[in-house]
Amino acid sequence: KMNDQIQAEFKKIFNGRFSTSESTRANYARGEDTYDPVLSKAVVFPETNEEVSKVLRLCNEHKIPVVPFGTGTSLEGNVVGNEKGITICLEKMNKILSVNVEDFDCRVQACVTKEQLNDYLREDGVFFPIDPGANAAIGGMASTSASGTMAVKYGTMKTVISGLTVVLPNGDIINTGSRTKKTSAGYNLTNLFIGSEGTLGIITEVQLRLSPIPVSYTHLTL
């Protein structure tokens, strides 16, 4: 249960990045869906894997529900708040961590959007091909196993993700997969988390496979 003592702990850890104001809670009460908004007890804005871990350890200890929130483009009610819980907004985790053009891969934090990433990659002649329509966050696309209009050629999120950093409900931080094109080293934990919609842990970093930008396009009308 969220009480004054727990709120004080969060404020001590996150300072101005923990809010219980009604206006802030209302801003993160739902996505772009038609569901009724639900205001969580508080909203916290972590910036690192370790800070997400601190939130989940504290919430796990006190049995407080959590709702991960990215860019809020969900149409299925994924990010509707919890009146007894905390919304964990990852919008400050929006850094492109590395790009390896020669190997056609990159690593990003969860709230990097597809448009942000492709704008960054354009001059290098590569792009991130999954396009679900909205300018979604990469972490949200991984959590919902997004696809899009180019899935026939480029596949879905399961096709282009080679590894993840995930914070488990108890606060443990794990890394799955690798940069290699194929690995037989143990269970495929990466695919376990893709599409899990935050129920198994919070995805904080994503390792992506990139594609060359097409030289030309052909449009067909049916």
Regions found by a protein language model. Give the residues of each.
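Conserved small/polar residues in nucleotide/adenosyl-binding loops
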Residues: 218-222
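Anion-binding (especially nucleotide phosphate/pyrophosphate-binding) glycine-rich loop
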Residues: 80-93, 98-138
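Hydrophobic, small-residue-rich alpha-helical packing segments that form membrane-like cores
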Residues: 116, 121-122, 130, 134-136, ...
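Structural signature of FAD isoalloxazine-binding scaffolds in flavoprotein oxidoreductases
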Residues: 45-46, 76-94, 109, 150-170, ...
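Conserved phosphate/anionic-ligand binding catalytic regions in large, soluble enzymes, centered on
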Residues: 192-202
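N-terminal flexible segment immediately upstream of the FAD-binding catalytic core
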Residues: 1-57, 73-104
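Flexible, low-complexity linker/loop segments at domain and module junctions
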Residues: 209-217
